[in-house]
């Protein structure tokens, strides 16, 4: 009923959050999607415990079954106490580096036709492939946020949509301008990131 109310009110997408004590966002979103026709689901995911190869297939499956009603919001984590509830002892900057590697892997898995091998700092796998591709092209949109230097730099390198808090417009304009400069430094087109 909650998701139906959002759809009837004209929302295009709703956030399904993530905490160390919340219900599984994919299961919640899939249940809600079965009871709506158009509403999209921005599913929050925190890298660290689910392999990017598994999440890539899981998200692509959801994307196909709902004909493109998914986006992912990659969250690097809250405070250390929240992280440790799930057994994650990486420090703040390391968590952001892990998120950057995770997002790159997702995009590689979703856009390459050949098997993918990766030997990175946080993840290692050989010849990963999926027989299930994304419905959306070129891939499922990846949202990302954060205000620290680590977050801004990782987001500039990897995300499709940079999420901001609701703040005064003049502050948001400054943040957007700064973020676009960071995107340009990475060699990406700032207009390609929303």
Q: What are these model-derived regions, one by one?
A:
Residues 14-16, 40-45, 70-74, 142-145, ...:
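Hydrophobic faces of well-ordered beta-strands that scaffold small-molecule active sites
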Residues 1-36, 40, 133, 137-140:
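N-terminal beta1-alpha1-beta2 module of alpha/beta enzyme domains
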Residues 22-29, 168-183:
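Active-site-adjacent beta->alpha loops and helix N-cap segments on the catalytic face
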Residues 10, 35-39, 66, 156-162:
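Glycine-enriched alpha-helix->loop->beta-strand junction motifs that scaffold or abut catalytic
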Residues 25-46, 98-105, 185-186, 190:
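Alpha-helix-loop-beta-strand connector modules within alpha/beta enzyme cores
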Residues 1, 49-117, 165-177:
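Flexible, glycine-rich active-site loops centered on histidine and acidic residues
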Residues 6, 10, 32, 62, ...:
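Conserved, mostly hydrophobic/aromatic
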Residues 1-5, 55-58, 144-154:
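Short, acidic/polar
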């Amino acid at each position: 009923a909650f998701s139906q109310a959002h759809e009837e009110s004209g929302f295009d997408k709703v956030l399904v959050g993530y905490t160390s004590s919340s219900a599984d966002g994919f299961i919640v979103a899939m249940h809600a999607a079965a009871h709506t026709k158009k509403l999209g689901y921005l599913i929050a995911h925190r890298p660290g415990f689910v392999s990017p190869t598994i999440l890539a297939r899981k998200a692509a499956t959801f994307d196909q079954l709902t004909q493109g009603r998914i986006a992912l919001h990659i969250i690097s984590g809250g405070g250390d106490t929240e992280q440790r509830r799930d057994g994650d002892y990486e420090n703040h900057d390391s968590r952001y580096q892990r998120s950057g590697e995770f997002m790159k892997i997702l995009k590689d898995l979703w856009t390459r036709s050949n098997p993918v091998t990766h030997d990175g700092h946080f993840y290692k796998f050989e010849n990963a492939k999926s027989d299930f591709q994304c419905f959306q092209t070129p891939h499922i949109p990846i949202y990302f946020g954060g205000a620290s230097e680590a977050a801004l730099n990782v987001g500039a390198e990897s995300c499709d949509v940079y999420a901001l808090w609701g703040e005064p417009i003049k502050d948001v304009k400054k943040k957007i301008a700064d973020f676009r400069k960071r995107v340009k430094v990475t060699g990406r087109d700032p207009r390609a990131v929303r």
